[in-house]
Regions:
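Active-site loop ensemble at the mouth of alpha/beta enzyme cores that anchors a bound cofactor
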Residues: 166-173
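N-terminal glycine-/serine-/threonine-rich phosphate-binding loop
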Residues: 1-43, 65-75
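Short, solvent-exposed S/T- and G/P-enriched segments that are highly enriched in secreted/extracellular
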Residues: 148, 235-240
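Catalytic core of tubulin tyrosine ligase-like
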Residues: 246
């Protein structure tokens, strides 16, 4: 596997690992490298179905030569890596709650085609099934205890074509962006989806939007809460997330990150289009249930 090969290369003292693939491949490689004290640099040539991580790093997607040229600029950043229960690692997002659990009923072929969250555009009918549950969430600034329908712990701003779920997320600040969704009301959820496209959800009354270097999520009921880590099943809560600050040195498009805008190649619009379609279908559902 990519994880085993990355671990072997790291142990052998290689200076550089080049990951050619999508988010899943990068996750495996980072997971292979992360347990070691001395780690090689990482370069990415995005060739996968979903390339959210490359999007966050402003690396040209579906253009291997452009990605190689970017690597040649020799711009690197020591990025944060998430760790789950001192075991698994993730590079983009961890999530839990009702929506996460319902997504496991969506056929895997759709997940393969659209990536985590983006493929939910094909499953907007899941929204009426979302339910809240009581949890205790411990973070750097205190404790939240109450009912939530879902939560997200994000390392980057880009998730499945939704580029403003965590609009102020930074790659190297040592902090997760923690988002707690406090409603299961269909109309309020539909409104939130529209807000996510614009990034205006962060101030909504149904959202707790926080920054934290560590997060612990504990269910306060007997109902199981499944965790999703970078789009894959990551066990059940209680769960602790730890931010490994500046853990991997990676080649990035530093000019674009500093300018805070996206490359916008025409071939790279697919996920944005899916995200927009999700919002449109949500609006349509909102009209139908009135």
């Amino acid at each position: 596997s990519a994880q085993k090969e990355a671990a072997r290369a790291t142990e052998a003292g290689f200076d550089l690992i080049v990951a050619a693939g999508g988010d899943g491949t990068i996750n495996e490689i980072v997971s292979g490298m992360s347990p070691f004290d001395k780690r090689p640099k990482l370069a990415i040539i995005p060739t996968g179905t979903t390339n959210d991580f490359a999007r966050a790093l402003k690396i040209p997607r579906n253009k291997p030569l452009a990605a190689v040229e970017m690597i040649g600029k020799n711009q690197t950043l020591n990025i944060d890596v998430g760790q789950v229960n001192d075991a698994e690692y993730f590079i983009n997002i961890a999530a839990g709650g009702s929506l996460t659990e319902l997504t496991y009923s969506v056929p895997s072929r759709l997940k393969t085609a659209f990536g985590y969250l983006a493929y939910l555009a094909k499953g907007v009918d899941l929204l009426p099934q979302i339910r809240k549950r009581k949890v205790k969430v411990t973070h750097d600034d205190g404790v939240f205890e109450g009912e939530i329908s879902m939560f997200f712990a994000a390392l980057t701003n880009s998730v499945g074509g939704f580029e403003k779920i965590a609009p102020d997320a930074k790659l190297d600040d040592g902090l997760f962006t923690l988002i707690l969704v406090k409603t299961d009301n269909l109309f309020e959820l539909l409104a939130l989806i529209s807000m996510v496209i614009k990034g205006s959800h962060v101030d909504d009354v149904n959202i707790e939007y926080l920054k934290s270097s560590q997060i612990k999520v504990e269910p306060l009921t007997d109902k199981k809460m499944m965790i999703n880590v970078d789009g894959e099943y990551g066990g059940d809560a209680p769960v602790t997330f730890r931010n490994l600050h500046g853990h991997i040195e990676i080649f990035v498009n530093l000019d674009e990150i500093n300018n805070d805008h996206y490359l916008g190649d025409e071939e790279e619009e697919d996920l944005e289009a899916v995200a927009q379609k999700f919002a449109e279908e949500a609006e349509q559902l909102k009209e139908e249930v009135k």
